Amino acid sequence: MTRMKYLVAAATLSLFLAGCSGSKEEVPDNPPNEIYATAQQKLQDGNWRQAITQLEALDNRYPFGPYSQQVQLDLIYAYYKNADLPLAQAAIDRFIRLNPTHPNIDYVMYMRGLTNMALDDSALQGFFGVDRSDRDPQHARAAFSDFSKLVRGYPNSQYTTDATKRLVFLKDRLAKYEYSVAEYYTERGAWVAVVNRVEGMLRDYPDTQATRDALPLMENAYRQMQMNAQAEKVAKIIAANSSNT
């Protein structure tokens, strides 16, 4: 019992010291151009935490200074790279609200998509190789919306090519989730729900493997409901897909 108390106390002390060591450093009251130069050097070095410290000091001390908009853009990037994703989201929303016509607004939209993708990801599950397709894709949907708006609104943006590639990945992610839901309804014999779910997949994600994989679930659901004519139509689609692969 004494040993357990010692271990708990030691763990608590370690957490306290870690919190102290991670506290923000004081930024000298230098001219804004010097603080900005220091922040840029920290960004180039990949020292995201110290870059954030410098940039936040600039943002707080000179909110309407000559570097204000660039500081906000740099903070978005630094927060994202440092995995401070809620802070990145807040900085993005703030920038769009205050600067809706900024020439780099396409970059901010791109960063919002990246941030939502990162929020959808799970480092722990990814490390252990856990399939994430059945998790709520709230942030994946948001990222899909972000990148779609970027591609439609700024087709000539330098970020559009990468955004388009990410849309393919996100479409597959969302379709896999819908497939997992259709499987869930199949296991419970909720045949109408299965049909409705797969119909949604055919409408929203027709060119994904998950949608093709869901067609047998739809066929089976129709047969369970004695709707054989509809089941035969789905069976023909399945056969046509098989002949084209």
Curated annotation (Swiss-Prot):
Lipid-modified residues, S-diacylglycerol cysteine kind: C20
Family: Belongs to the BamD family.
Entry keyword Membrane: yes
Residue ranges of coiled coil: none
GO CC, alphabetical: Bam protein complex; cell outer membrane; membrane
HAMAP family linked: OM_assembly_BamD
Knocked-out gene: effects: Depletion decreases the density of outer membrane proteins, but does not significantly affect transport of lipopolysaccharides to the outer membrane.
Keywords of this entry: Cell outer membrane, Lipoprotein, Membrane, Palmitate, Signal
Role noted for this protein: Part of the outer membrane protein assembly complex (Bam), which is involved in assembly and insertion of beta-barrel proteins into the outer membrane. Constitutes, with BamA, the core component of the assembly machinery. Probably involved in transient protein interactions. Efficient substrate folding and insertion into the outer membrane requires all 5 subunits.
Protein name (Swiss-Prot/TrEMBL): Outer membrane protein assembly factor BamD
Domain of life: Bacteria
Oligomeric and partner information: Part of the Bam complex, which is composed of the outer membrane protein BamA, and four lipoproteins BamB, BamC, BamD and BamE. Forms a subcomplex with BamC and BamE. Interacts directly with BamA. The Bam complex has the shape of a hat, with the BamA beta-barrel crown in the outer membrane and the periplasmic brim formed by the BamA POTRA domains and the 4 lipoproteins.
Intracellular or extracellular location(s): Cell outer membrane
PANTHER family linked to this entry: OUTER MEMBRANE PROTEIN ASSEMBLY FACTOR BAMD (PTHR37423:SF1), SOLUBLE LYTIC MUREIN TRANSGLYCOSYLASE-RELATED (PTHR37423)
Membrane topology (UniProt): Lipid-anchor
Lipid-attached positions, N-palmitoyl cysteine: C20
UniProt xrefs under Pfam families: YfiO
Keyword Transcription regulation: no
Note on domains (UniProt): The N-terminal may interact with various proteins as a chaperone to assist in the folding and insertion of proteins into the outer membrane. The C-terminal region may serve as the link between BamA, BamC and BamE.
Signal peptide (UniProt feature, chain positions): 1-19
GO biological process: Gram-negative-bacterium-type cell outer membrane assembly; protein insertion into membrane
